[in-house]
From Swiss-Prot:
Known function: Inhibits calcineurin-dependent transcriptional responses by binding to the catalytic domain of calcineurin A. Could play a role during central nervous system development.
Originating organism: Gallus gallus
Protein name: Calcipressin-3
GO annotation terms (biological process): calcium-mediated signaling
Biased composition (Low complexity): 8-19
Chain spans, region Disordered: 1-25, 204-225
Length: 249
């Protein structure tokens, strides 16, 4: 009986372990193959790596340089290198992102000439089409007329022609006939009505205003007199000293 109990317990533990292992695999690799393929899609990764804190011998000794390049040629035969001696960095350019990812995973923090090799992905070069979509687009031109002052005319707007100015040609003709000191007949007289004649005369109001308000003359400002102390000092300087010791002022 004890043997049967132990056997059933071991079977339950094995089933529990297998179920836990299956759940972990599903969590890691996804429930189906599509999720796994989506996780393994490396098209968004860059094709270049940066090796930082590279040993100085790589930049100076040809043998060390060839040994360093041999680490990455295993993953891609078309790999190229760009050395930056002042920064102690090397840019490694692969032909595909898969090779760059494999090199980053397998060679990161590995020992090379007594130093740990630090590998980092280079910045992804975004195309112009993708870059334009990542920014906020301006509003449609249909609603731009709401901005004050308007950046563009509203939809359906048409420029209207200015109306022709109204000119009273009769008035212009009458004004052109007027002359200085001449009379002008507005309405001709008839047997029952008198004629209306306009006589141009000088204005009397202008003469009256000149008499009432004569032009003011600007008086010149008088020069102020100097104070008494300055006058006394000037008189003292006018005095002369004679040879005999007497002073004449």
């Amino acid at each position: 009986m004890l043997r049967d109990t132990m056997k059933s317990w071991s079977d339950s533990q094995s089933d529990l372990y297998s179920s836990d292992q299956e759940e972990e695999e599903q969590m890691i690799f996804g429930e189906n193959e599509d999720d796994f393929e989506e996780m393994m899609d490396l098209s968004d990764l860059p094709t270049s790596l940066f090796a930082c804190s590279v040993h100085e011998a790589v930049f100076e000794v040809q043998e060390e340089k060839e040994r360093f390049e041999a680490l990455f040629t295993v993953y891609d035969n078309q790999v190229t290198f760009q050395l930056f001696k002042s920064f102690r960095r090397v840019r490694i350019n692969f032909s595909n992102p898969e090779a760059a990812a494999r090199a980053r995973i397998e060679l990161h923090e590995t020992d090379f000439s007594g130093k740990k090799l630090k590998l980092y992905f280079a910045q992804v070069q975004v195309s112009s089409e993708v870059g334009d979509k990542s920014y906020l687009l301006p509003p449609q031109p249909v609603k731009q007329f709401l901005i004050s002052p308007p950046a563009s005319p509203p939809v359906g707007w048409k420029q209207s022609e200015d109306a022709t100015p109204l000119i009273n040609y009769d008035l212009l003709c009458a004004v052109s006939k007027l002359g200085p000191g001449e009379k002008y007949e507005l309405h001709a007289g008839t047997e029952s009505t008198p004629s209306v004649v306009v006589h141009v005369c000088e204005s009397e109001t202008e003469e009256e205003e000149e008499i009432k308000n004569p032009k003011q003359k600007i008086m010149q400002t008088r020069r102020p007199e100097p104070p008494a102390t300055i006058l006394n000092e000037s008189k003292a300087f006018d005095c002369t000293l004679e040879v005999g010791g007497t002073i004449h002022c």
